[in-house]
Design a protein with these regions (language model features):
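C-terminal subregions of glycosyltransferases and related glycan-biosynthesis enzymes
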Residues: 160-236
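GHKL-family ATP-binding catalytic core of two-component histidine kinases
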Residues: 38, 52-53, 116
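Short aromatic/hydrophobic "clamp" motif used to bind/position activated sugar donors
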Residues: 42
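Conserved nucleotide-sugar donor-binding catalytic segment
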Residues: 35, 92-180
Length: 236
């Protein structure tokens, strides 16, 4: 609906365009592309973002030279309402075993990442049941299993701040992060130390959500997040 398929026609047969007949969400679109891909590496470009020239070349070279890393990602230039802004401290980037850093919020932009296609056979595809935070869910599944490398170069431009963005339209994204955290607790690769970290983060998010819903008069949802805390032995 954003005119992408029309733009692709200018490239002739050099690019293969795969379309859904109806909007099934970003996860379904990514998953279909992954399943149709023939190459050994996968990269995404969301509609609001731009790749800087040379991005793919730099990442391919890194993954070729570092077979023990399944994924690398880059730094970003942020544009909000047409003006360049500096990311906040909470969006800082890290290399290595970054699972703990990925728990509060999503620090990897999908458009900045490149990964080996065989990674999806190890961690699964994007969760199509999540309308937002599907990337948060995916990065957690990756980072709890593998180290991730940060390329300290600004190789994508993230444009945001307009009202039609999906992330701008979804109130309380932590609701979906809690779902992702609950899912993670059932993963056999999650050890006791990681489990404790997940529960601490879940407690923070459930406390905020519960208080927020009670404040807005939604007692049903407020009690729901208290019940999640009780289920995992978290004191209220």
């Amino acid at each position: 609906t954003d005119g992408t398929s029309e733009e692709m026609k200018q490239f002739g047969g050099r690019l293969k365009v795969i379309e859904h007949t109806e909007n099934r969400g970003v996860s379904a679109a990514r998953n279909r592309g992954i399943l149709h891909a023939k190459g050994k590496y996968i990269a995404f470009l969301d509609s609001d973002d731009l790749w800087v020239k040379g991005k793919l070349k730099i990442q391919v070279a890194f993954l070729d030279d570092n077979p023990h890393y399944p994924l690398c990602y880059t730094d970003e230039i942020w544009i909000r309402r047409g003006k360049r802004v500096n990311p906040m401290k909470k969006h800082a980037k890290y290399s290595g075993w970054i699972f703990e850093k990925c728990l509060p919020l999503c620090i990897i932009s999908p458009s900045s990442a490149m990964m080996r296609k065989n990674l999806f056979s190890k961690v699964g595809l994007f969760d199509e049941a999540l309308p937002v935070c599907e990337d948060y869910d995916f990065w957690l599944r990756v980072s709890v299993r593998f180290p991730i490398f940060f390329i300290n170069k600004k190789l994508i431009i993230k444009r945001g701040g307009h009202p039609d963005q999906l992330s701008s339209r979804s109130w309380g994204n932590d609701r979906y992060r809690v779902i992702a955290l609950e899912k993670l607790l059932s993963e056999p690769c999650v050890g006791q130390e990681e489990r404790e970290s997940v529960l601490k983060e879940m407690e923070k998010k459930c406390q905020v959500l519960s208080k927020g819903f009670f404040k807005r008069g939604n007692e049903f949802e407020g009690r729901y997040y208290r019940e999640i805390m009780r289920r995992y032995g978290i004191e209220i």
